[in-house]
From Swiss-Prot:
Acylphosphatase-like domain span: 6-92
EC number of the protein: 3.6.1.7
Gene: acyP
Recorded catalytic activity of this chain's protein: an acyl phosphate + H2O = a carboxylate + phosphate + H(+)
One Gene Ontology molecular-function label: acylphosphatase activity
Protein name: Acylphosphatase
Species, as recorded: Gloeobacter violaceus (strain ATCC 29082 / PCC 7421)
InterPro entries xref list: Acylphosphatase (IPR020456), Acylphosphatase-like_dom (IPR001792), Acylphosphatase-like_dom_sf (IPR036046), Acylphosphatase_CS (IPR017968)
Principal EC category: hydrolase
Entry keyword Metal-binding: no
Length: 93
């Protein structure tokens, strides 16, 4: 079994008001990835993904496009030590 990884992700562009957080939660649940997602005051979306490396990478790749109404212009990823998250949630902005 692969060791879990943790990716801290920031997505910029037209990513708020386009169902990005809810769609990210759905994509994470399909991949079996834990973590969270939230809107930032500066217009970006911030997320943390924890899970098997391949599943986390698929979710990062999904974020490069996001849901149909999104226009992703920037994606920043920082890898961190996993914290053992067990579910995925949308945090209040």
């Amino acid at each position: 079994m692969a060791t879990a990884v943790r990716a801290h992700v920031w997505v910029g562009g037209k990513v708020q008001g386009v169902y990005f957080r809810a769609a990210t939660r759905e994509a994470a649940q399909r991949q079996g990835v834990a973590g969270w997602v939230r809107n930032l005051p500066d217009g970006r979306v911030e997320a943390v993904f924890e899970g098997p490396p391949a599943a986390v990478q698929r979710l990062i790749d999904w974020c490069r496009q996001g849901p149909p109404a999104a226009v992703v212009e920037q994606l920043r990823v920082a890898y961190e030590l996993p914290e053992g998250l067990t579910h995925f949630e949308v945090l209040r902005s």
